Amino acid sequence: MSEETVPEAASPPPPQGQPYFDRFSEDDPEYMRLRNRAADLRQDFNLMEQKKRVTMILQSPSFREELEGLIQEQMKKGNNSSNIWALRQIADFMASTSHAVFPTSSMNVSMMTPINDLHTADSLNLAKGERLMRCKISSVYRLLDLYGWAQLSDTYVTLRVSKEQDHFLISPKGVSCSEVTASSLIKVNILGEVVEKGSSCFPVDTTGFCLHSAIYAARPDVRCIIHLHTPATAAVSAMKWGLLPVSHNALLVGDMAYYDFNGEMEQEADRINLQKCLGPTCKILVLRNHGVVALGDTVEEAFYKIFHLQAACEIQVSALSSAGGVENLILLEQEKHRPHEVGSVQWAGSTFGPMQKSRLGEHEFEALMRMLDNLGYRTGYTYRHPFVQEKTKHKSEVEIPATVTAFVFEEDGAPVPALRQHAQKQQKEKTRWLNTPNTYLRVNVADEVQRSMGSPRPKTTWMKADEVEKSSSGMPIRIENPNQFVPLYTDPQEVLEMRNKIREQNRQDVKSAGPQSQLLASVIAEKSRSPSTESQLMSKGDEDTKDDSEETVPNPFSQLTDQELEEYKKEVERKKLELDGEKETAPEEPGSPAKSAPASPVQSPAKEAETKSPLVSPSKSLEEGTKKTETSKAATTEPETTQPEGVVVNGREEEQTAEEILSKGLSQMTTSADTDVDTSKDKTESVTSGPMSPEGSPSKSPSKKKKKFRTPSFLKKSKKKEKVES
């Protein structure tokens, strides 16, 4: 059968474009043999191909992991059917026949029994943490076998499971180190009596456990004991000088104790002598002419001690055999050559990386566990330090928490084809928002439409953090130190005094404006504008016609030079003297228009313009304003000039009523900027016509009464007309 399969496997593939019946010639002997083959042979070949594919699947590590996950999931649900049991058998078979990850390793084995053979149902009756303890002890047995340190008898590794109940784990008698599994370990008490029998049928070696029980009774702090009697350790234990400090490994071992062991620990005197010899802190016990025992608080520490002790013994035996005696060896001094256990072993990352405390020998033991897992032993060890470092996320991802995490679901029903693209885009935005919520910030942006309408209300939007213009406050800073924002090179006592002072103010509930800013000390805030002068001049009867939107009258003297101010003072003094002379002549000739002309400066030039042309256009040019200033200056030089014809200030010819003058005055106040310049200059001239104080500043006339609201000039004018008529 095998001869027939060789040509079939070696035959070249037929061309793809040729028909099936044209591929073979009828005279071809291979074709004739295949055509005459029996149907059962063809079926056998097909089954062989199927089995080949099944074998490839079973040897796949991914399929094995998936199968183990399925078994664990079903066992958690409580499904203990025969199918699950069959799957478990398949998984165990695949684990025992799988190839090693590193086939070039010298310790490669073709067949191995998995260490962690505890299933979910078996782990229910175990104590807390006992499953991991069983896996560790079984792994140590496998390491002793791989390193060649295992002997046929009295090579035991024990572990204290519970301090309260004094239960211990030990391998059964007659089981080699390569056969020990987690389920085969036996749980015994301090007397060596079986508490829980393992999966094997072998008993406990009570004679070999006597030494371990005596050490556990003398040292309650010890959790693990490893007993070896390899040729190197037995040779060193037979030497009178014991272990010599000839290597670095001998220094790493630490303090040692020597005890004359006779092979039994049945007598009470032997236990007392062992306790005295061992002491409270010693971790290495050398049994004379027998071997060594390593003690440890953990399994990792015990294996760390026994590993370096075995290496030190091998170095010493080799050195003595080559040197010919102790006098030819160079011994290290313990005080000068101290090992760096704290920096290299006990503290992981003291030289590189963060300070993270670890147990003695933990990193070395985890490296060996990874080696066993790669070889397919399935140690079941729980790693504290992962082999591949995970990528650390940047702090910016958590500096700003997510403000909004909710989203709106789409409405039920068939999606509209026209909106399908929009829905997909919305879904992408929602997914991106949920995945990275910290890349968006809530920003108040002024809407252009609302700004054009005059509404200052901003518009709230969400923008990316990179697109937002950062303010002076910047990004939030994580406070890691309470004095992070204290200025450098400051006295700590001053900081404490200031802090106590602030706390005292908080206790007394003192309300203040807070510390004054040094940057804003020279800034002067703008005062709110006072109500317009025109609204103050309105009478109480005309309160309905007030206009609150009018602006304050500008200062009439702001645009004058020093020379003009001096001329203005002289003109005011001169007119004041003329007014005093006119008051005496006024009762004699009240109706004379020529004598009333000097009194015209009391009336504002703006009112003269209103009487002359009440319908003045609001858009006057600046040239007319300059002409008015020139005419006002000419009037100051020639005080006796008369007013134009047809204009009567206090006569009956004025037909305009007070209401009309008031409405026209208000309409002229709302004109453009050109009219404001003209009116400001006219008001400047009107102020010049008023009385002056001795210092030169305008002041009120002593004949006027102090009132809350000053009566407008055009109302006074109407009262004067009534007096003249009477």
UniProtKB/Swiss-Prot annotation:
CC per GO annotation: cytoplasmic vesicle; cytoskeleton; cytosol; F-actin capping protein complex; plasma membrane; plasma membrane raft; postsynaptic density
Expression sites by tissue: Expressed mainly in brain, spleen, kidney cortex and medulla, and heart.
Biased composition (Basic residues): 702-726
InterPro entries, alphabetized: Aldolase-II_Adducin_sf (IPR051017), Aldolase_II/adducin_N (IPR001303), Aldolase_II/adducin_N_sf (IPR036409)
UniProt entry keywords in alphabetical sequence: Actin-binding, Calmodulin-binding, Cell membrane, Cytoplasm, Cytoskeleton, Membrane, Phosphoprotein
Feature: compositional bias, Low complexity: 588-606, 632-645, 689-701
GO molecular function list: actin binding; actin filament binding; calmodulin binding; protein dimerization activity; protein heterodimerization activity; protein homodimerization activity; protein kinase binding; spectrin binding
One family name in Pfam for this protein: Aldolase_II
Membrane topology category: Peripheral membrane protein
Positions of modified residues (Phosphothreonine): T55, T533, T611, T675
Biased segments, Polar residues type: 665-674
Location(s) in or outside the cell: Cytoplasm, Cytoskeleton; Cell membrane
Residue ranges of the region described as Interaction with calmodulin: 425-444, 704-721
PTM sites of type Phosphoserine: 11, 25, 60, 344, 530, 532, 535, 592, 596, 600, 604, 613, 617, 619, 621, 686, 689, 693, 697, 699, 701, 703, 713
Chain positions covered by the region annotation Disordered: 1-25, 525-726
Post-translational modification: The N-terminus is blocked.
GO BP of this protein: actin cytoskeleton organization; actin filament bundle assembly; barbed-end actin filament capping; hemopoiesis; leukocyte migration; leukocyte tethering or rolling; positive regulation of protein binding; protein-containing complex assembly
Composition skew (Basic and acidic residues), residue ranges: 566-586, 621-631
Subunit structure: Heterodimer of an alpha and a beta subunit. Found in a complex with ADD2, DMTN and SLC2A1. Interacts with SLC2A1.
Function: Membrane-cytoskeleton-associated protein that promotes the assembly of the spectrin-actin network. Binds to the erythrocyte membrane receptor SLC2A1/GLUT1 and may therefore provide a link between the spectrin cytoskeleton to the plasma membrane. Binds to calmodulin. Calmodulin binds preferentially to the beta subunit.
Assigned protein family: Belongs to the aldolase class II family. Adducin subfamily.
UniProt remark on domains: Each subunit is comprised of three regions: a NH2-terminal protease-resistant globular head region, a short connecting subdomain, and a protease-sensitive tail region.
Name by which UniProt lists this protein: Beta-adducin
Species the sequence originates in: Homo sapiens
